[in-house]
Amino acid sequence: MEQQAHCDEVFAGRATVTHCRGCLKCNLIQRCAIKGDDWDTLRLKILNSDVLAFASPIYFHHLTSPLKKILDRFRSFMHVQITGEGLNHTPWQEWKKHFVLLLSQGSPDAADAKPVIDLFTFLTHALGPGNSLHTIVGTRLAVSKQVAMSQDDLRSLYLKLELPAPLAEIDYERNRTLLQSCFNLGRGLAEKNGA
């Protein structure tokens, strides 16, 4: 019998999370000093998770501002020391998490997601060598649920978007592969974590 993994969904746009103020109090008290928002609840969910999956559209070459607010508060998970050569990041506790980054963007060039991937690469490394980052980028995605559209629906959409009709067939197959990659990643991580 297969076990089911427990999953908590957090919608960044609905979470009440105050912007990081850069006060650096977290360097002294080993947690974020900001009170009165959803961070304490989110923090516990993050710390108790084996897998952290982040999904975001790429808007103007970066992730959404609500998600960025949450990521900025990750600063409180580590001590940051300024040195003559740069910054040393030391997590308050050992992290061994799988970070999953699922990005969708209108651009047909996956390289346009690089700034977001670079941010998550930095974050997973700063939180310790026990972490891993798994990234999947969907390209030429302009509307909600486009990745699951039929080939005919894609053709109709592409006419409205003034995209060449032959791209619909190419993108339909690419989207099927993308969805299968997401499924395979989820299944693989669930198996690694005993679900």
Indicate residue ranges for each PLM-predicted region.
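A short secondary-structure junction signal
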Residues: 65, 111-115, 146-147
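C-terminal beta-strand edge segments of enzyme domains
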Residues: 144-147, 174
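Conserved beta-strand scaffold positions in the cores of enzyme catalytic domains, especially
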Residues: 7-9, 132-135
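Beta-strand-loop-alpha "switch" segments that mediate conformational coupling across diverse proteins
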Residues: 133-145
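Short, surface-exposed amphipathic charged segments that create phosphate/polyanion-binding patches used
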Residues: 148-156
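Short, catalytically relevant binding-site loops at active-site mouths
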Residues: 59-61, 107-109, 141-142
